[in-house]
Amino acid sequence: MSITGIKGFNDLLPAESGLWQFIEQTARQVFARYGFNEIRVPIVEKTELFCRSIGDTTDIVEKEMYTFMDKGGSSLTLRPEGTASVMRALIEHKLYALDSINKLYYMGPMFRHERPQKGRYRQFHQIGAEVTGAADPLIDAQVLLMVSRLFQEFGLTEPRLQINSLGCPACRPAYRQALVAFLAERQEALCEDCRRRQGTNPLRALDCKVPGCIEATQGAPAMVEHLCNECDQHFSMVQNYLTAAEVPFSLNPRMVRGLDYYTRTTFELVTGLLGAQSAVAAGGRYDGLVEQLGGPAVPGIGFALGVERVALLLGDRSFEKTPDLFIAVMGDAARTAGFRLMAALQDQGFWVETDCEGKSLKSQMRRADKLKSRYSIVLGDTELVAGSGTLKRMADGNQQPVHLEAATIAAAITGGGQT
């Protein structure tokens, strides 16, 4: 019996890799315009990192983390998200001392033990960005602007930006009290998890996906109605900056996100095209996280997008790459000459294929068609003696004579086949 992959851990096949490369390359280009540098962190961290950052009472920590004991007896976890690892690296390497503001981005796999479904997998991939060192609402607006522009570069206009404010430690207690009182009157309608968390983390009820909890929390108090003056001004300025930059957004007072470290501004890009998995990107401010992990009081804000979900939205768009030239050869001398020509053209940046199986000319041309090569050329004794051949444009059959020199063929391919 053959060995198959693990449920929820998917292979990325060659037919899909062009789309993923487009997503990653586009993100890198946009991040560069906004002054971000890449950071790469391990996929495995000490379990304590995620318990302290994400929160002990979140679904991620309670139910979804891949945690194991290593041979030294340490509890380790496959990272379920990227922000905690980036902040750990920021503290460990004292990046905050090198520059007052750090702009970092990352790409890579994350792991959560969830029920696999469309847009949700046990190994999934995120592209994220973090800014630390500035608490000004202008930074919030810059991050939101960047996210908006990134999706424009993807060619996606359907995802809608929703924002909320979760306040700060000064104003959240009053809101928590109001929310607990509201939930206490609806105990019977809440799921077991939401009832259990009322004493530790009642905000999780607003993020619960159980239908009964969604219905029971309709009309719940909104955090934006309980903001202190400072948080209210901060949130107002974020909205003013977004309006000034003509970034469309809407308020979603129910948005609390699934991680406990968020403060003040939170946001999601949502779509109705992915069923229950409506968020394709999300993030927010986390002003106390670095200090909570043992570092100095460094404010921060960031976001992450789901690569699989963006790929689903891009759908059937073709990012297939095809060879520039297929060199068909007849005879040993032609095979050697074809190999030399192929190497010279590859050195100039062209994708060139040739026969490696000793097949007939007819079979070689069938392979050129199958590969969807843009051009083909046949090399045999006649062509070698003449020092020239016929370059064929495969799309329409147009043929042009060319000298068997890499520079001449390169110019013909680049110029559309005209020599």
From Swiss-Prot:
HAMAP family: His_tRNA_synth
Reactions catalysed: tRNA(His) + L-histidine + ATP = L-histidyl-tRNA(His) + AMP + diphosphate + H(+)
PROSITE patterns, alphabetized: AA_TRNA_LIGASE_II (PS50862)
InterPro entries hit by this protein: aa-tRNA-synth_II (IPR006195), aa-tRNA-synth_II/BPL/LPL (IPR045864), Anticodon-bd (IPR004154), Anticodon-bd_dom_sf (IPR036621), His-tRNA-ligase (IPR015807), HisRS-like_core (IPR041715), HisRS/HisZ (IPR004516), HisRS_anticodon (IPR033656)
SUPFAM superfamilies from the UniProt entry: Class II aaRS ABD-related, Class II aaRS and biotin synthetases
Gene: hisS
Claim: Kinase is one of the keywords in the record: no
Subunit text: Homodimer.
Gene Ontology cellular component terms for the protein in this record: cytoplasm
Official protein name in the record: Histidine--tRNA ligase
